[in-house]
Amino acid sequence: AAIRGMIRETQLSVENLVQPLFLVSKETSREPVKSLPNTYRLGIRETLKEVEDSLNLGITNFILFPVVPDQYKDKFATYSHHEDNFYLKITAEIKRRFPETCLISDVAMDPYSTDGHDGLVRDGKIINDETLPILAKMAVAQAAAGFDLLGPSDMMDGRVGYMRQAL
């Protein structure tokens, strides 16, 4: 029902709005995003409060973006599908407390990779096909955490089909 309400034709309402949330791994945090006025990187408590406040306004759709600390980054984006990933834990907690939400993920390596690219890099080149299994693991982990929609924002060829197969 939440997805149907979000994408219904010819009627613009609060059901069509998607609230972006930028998540950090801290329990409590509200850091301003300088390039986006009135936008913040939120800790766990602030994220849950923001979701609750938005629901009270009728906003049920959220796209969640992780802001990953450098210590969790590596060239294979291993933390992206790790069971201790704060992004996945916050998602599960949102769905537990607010099951009526529609949560949209960001499937991409760049928040988790040390080089900041959406794909594996070898000798200065993006390695498309070897990236696909990583994106698939990420998609499976995000679906298991409770995301309703998976949003692949990377630029890898064949990623959607590969993710669908994995799911």
Predicted regions and their residues:
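N-terminal amphipathic/basic leader segments beginning at the initiator methionine
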Residues: A1-R8
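Alpha/beta enzyme core
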Residues: E9-V18, V24-L167
